[in-house]
Amino acid sequence: MMPGPRPRKGPQARGQGVAAAKQMGLFMEFGPEDMLLGMDEAEDDEDLEAELLALTGEAQTTGKKPAPKGQAPLPMAHIEKLAADCMRDVEEEEEEEGLEEDAELLTELQEVLGVDEETEPLDGDEVADPGGSEEENGLEDTEPPVQTAVLTASAPAAQAGASQGLHALLEERIHNYREAAASAKEAGEAAKARRCERGLKTLESQLASVRRGRKINEDEIPPPVALGKRPLAPQEPANRSPETDPPAPPALESDNPSQPETSLPGISAQPVSDLDPDPRALLSSRQREYKVAALSAKRAGELDRARELMRIGKRFGAVLEALEKGQPVDLSAMPPAPEDLKPQQASQAPTAPSVIPPAVERVQPVMAPDVPATPVAPTESQTVLDALQQRLNKYREAGIQARSGGDERKARMHERIAKQYQDAIRAHRAGRKVNFAELPVPPGFPPIPGLESTMGVEEDAVAATLAAAEKLASAEDSAPADKDEDEPPGHLQGEPPAQAPVAKKPARPTVPSSQRLPEPRASSSKESPSPSVREQLALLEARKLQYQRAALQAKRSQDLEQAKAYLRVAKWLEAQIIQARSGRPVDLSKVPSPLTDEEGDFILIHHEDLRLSQKAEEVYAQLQKMLLEQQEKCLLFSKQFMHQGNVAETTRFEKLAQDRKKQLEILQLAQAQGLDPPTHHFELKTFQTVRIFSELNSTEMHLIIVRGMNLPAPPGVTPDDLDAFVRFEFHYPNSDQAQKSKTAVVKNTNSPEFDQLFKLNINRNHRGFKRVIQSKGIKFEIFHKGSFFRSDKLVGTAHLKLERLENECEIREIVEVLDGRKPTGGKLEVKVRLREPLSGQDVQMVTENWLVLEPRGL
């Protein structure tokens, strides 16, 4: 059943919609008179009407008050009068407030009353008079402004007597915290020093508040702290260097001349600063003059005078700080202007150090005018800790001077050195071992007590090592004569002094120069070195000893430049030894190769009456040639294993090279003595070697086009008229950016010798390079050079595959020259080299006929 339409409502009665809207708050009538004069219930208030009539001056009527809508506005004269009254009240209040805050009136009042500026409160609202407070009495402030200022200024004077005990307590507590902070800094307790400094700042702020007349909470005063034991009390303050002493607090002075200078500031009756109208401005201007003069002296190159002026200028900062804290200072000893300082110091220099007693120097060193122009040498310390502290203070002062002079780099350097000394002091106090040789020493400082200076030889390393070599030579010359070789003793007596090394050859294996260096510093490592590290150390020490001996031989032969070069290498090897002992890795590929002394370290003895047969000379020459070849092979294999980092194989081949050298020396000595060639035989020895081209980088590949053999000539050209050149193309990094080049033209031959090297850029780990190696290789094209009107003619092509570079570091092939796919009979010899194979190592087994000399043959 479908719902029917809703029944329509009847027409709404007229006026019902407006009534509903008014009921909902719409169409409300607002009158401006209602909003200004108030609500309806206040219209018939008789009190308000009477007050209004009294204000307007009209008589009260008994009739009914007209409606607000018909009320006439107030006369303009009354409105202007009310506005003038309101404005007059505000102006009077502002005028009174301006009188209370007028600085000129307050200054004039202080001069009349004689009240000190420091004891006057900064804000009159904080110290209020209980009798004249307008908040407590609720009265209007109708008193004159001068009377208010008098009450405000007299309040702190009443409170000054009550705060005498609190003032003395705060000063005593400040003195306690300063001593505790200094003791903690000397003991190296940074945390305690920071706590004391925070408490000191709190006490200073509380003392400043008390001096200004403000109230403080006594419960918030920091408690006293224990001073503790200072590590070293200075027994001779007169001998202390002014450069290492921290700035002492300024001297205190009172009106009474018989009163000691160390009296407290609260006891002094009249501070000296009252005699000077503005001591702070005078001190600031004088400090600025000294800084400008120091900067000018530094720019002029007078560094000593610049340091002196900067040191005096820094002392003004301590005096200004004391003046800000309210402490009285004595300006009678203030240094003069910088331009008057130099003649005054020259006249006072002979008598100044003996006039001032030590006590006065400690109480009032801030404004001392007689600063020594030259730095005083520090006294020798009695303990290690005292010496370290002296050096720490020296470097701190140097850092401050450098920063004040604008040299930030030098300041950071001195701060780093000071940090090293702080760590050393902390470690020494903890009982740990400290390597004092690594700490820099300031100029002019004596050595640390109980330790010998081991750094003197570093000033001239070459001269010191040569001197040690001279001692070694003198020690070897004094060796017994019964340790000589099998030589006629009468012959040695007839030799000149330049041939004296014959007698010292047996003593060379026991050269003490390997123990000369300060190697015990590496003994601080707790773990014993591993076998590989021991092998590295043995290799490096043997190599260093070899270069030291070579330097000694070069010095004896008057070749000082060569001796210095060998000593530099020995010093570098010494640094590598220290690095290896400390556990850090050493790059053996950078270790220099062993020296190959072609002349040998022996003397050839020539006998005029000895003549060898032609056959014996040929045998000697052949044996020497074989020994030299075997020695060179051993050195080559040793170098290859060194670049691989294989210490064991490197040492093995170096020993074989030394054995070959020794056999060669024996052979040459036998030949010099005129003996028959020694008995010898050959042994087959197989060596496992690793091939590497150390002169190549890992990012380059060498292509060498060696020669062409029987290259075909193009039609119309005879083989003898062939002008051939080779062009190659290597598709890396891609085909569009292939690396291309060509050889020079070799004319008039079909077997040209090119022997030309090309360097190709590669990336061993790139996938594109490996793809080119495995699939594409290198393409070669052989051309015949055309004439002026003729272009180049293609002779043939060749292709070299590079898959063998995966396991080999060199490919040497003779590739066939093709004409399309047809062989032409020509050949092209090429080589490709990498530093190392792409994967693995190029291990080769080499078999040699090893020459062995029998000792019985001599």
Swiss-Prot record:
Its main location: nucleus. Residues 112-164, 180-199, 204-284, 329-352, 470-533 are annotated as: Disordered. The modification Phosphoserine is found at S209, S593. Belongs to the CC2D1 family. It comes from the Eukaryota. Residues 186-199 have a biased composition (Basic and acidic residues). Residues 114-143 have a biased composition (Acidic residues). GO terms for biological process: regulation of transcription by RNA polymerase II. Residues 166-212, 611-635 form a coiled coil. Residues 153-164, 520-532 have a biased composition (Low complexity). GO terms for molecular function: DNA-binding transcription factor activity, RNA polymerase II-specific; DNA-binding transcription repressor activity, RNA polymerase II-specific; RNA polymerase II cis-regulatory region sequence-specific DNA binding. GO terms for cellular component: cytosol; endosome membrane; intracellular membrane-bounded organelle; nuclear envelope; nucleoplasm; nucleus. It is found in: Nucleus. The modification Phosphothreonine is found at T596. Residues 676-815 form the C2 domain. Widely distributed in brain and peripheral tissues. Gene3D superfamilies: C2 domain. Transcription factor that binds specifically to the DRE (dual repressor element) and represses HTR1A gene transcription in neuronal cells. This is Coiled-coil and C2 domain-containing protein 1B. Keywords: Coiled coil, Nucleus, Phosphoprotein, Transcription, Transcription regulation. Interacts with CHMP4B.
